[in-house]
Amino acid sequence: MAKTASPGATPPGNGTEPLPDNYEMALAELETLVARMEGGALSLEDSLTAYRRGATLVAFCQQQLEKVEQQVRVLDGATLKPLSSGTAATDGEDDDL
């Protein structure tokens, strides 16, 4: 089923909207929701619906980022190491940059 809602339409309240196809689409929808909510023109009920949708989109984006991070780790052969706070302070080589 194709999505036919226009960007200015009231968010549907059924909570069954499909997830976007990718991270970029989710982020764009999230930015639109935030702008509409900040605009102050939504009713309380519509704001709550938009908030719920936004929370779903945030979770989707986090999952997508975690998947990509895992793929990067695999491609790097698990050579990624966290930067310890002591390493940056004792290095001293790039302090003048």
From Swiss-Prot:
Residues 1-22 are annotated as: Disordered. The keyword Transmembrane helix does not apply. Its main location: cytoplasm. It is an enzyme of class 3 (hydrolase). It holds the Pfam family Exonuc_VII_S. One of its GO terms (cellular component) is exodeoxyribonuclease VII complex. Its EC number is 3.1.11.6. Keywords: Cytoplasm, Exonuclease, Hydrolase, Nuclease. The keyword Membrane does not apply. It catalyses: Exonucleolytic cleavage in either 5'- to 3'- or 3'- to 5'-direction to yield nucleoside 5'-phosphates. Heterooligomer composed of large and small subunits. NCBIfam families: PRK00977.1-5 (NF002141), xseB (TIGR01280). Belongs to the XseB family. This is Exodeoxyribonuclease 7 small subunit. It comes from Burkholderia lata (strain ATCC 17760 / DSM 23089 / LMG 22485 / NCIMB 9086 / R18194 / 383). The lineage of its organism: Bacteria, Pseudomonadati, Pseudomonadota, Betaproteobacteria, Burkholderiales. The gene is xseB.
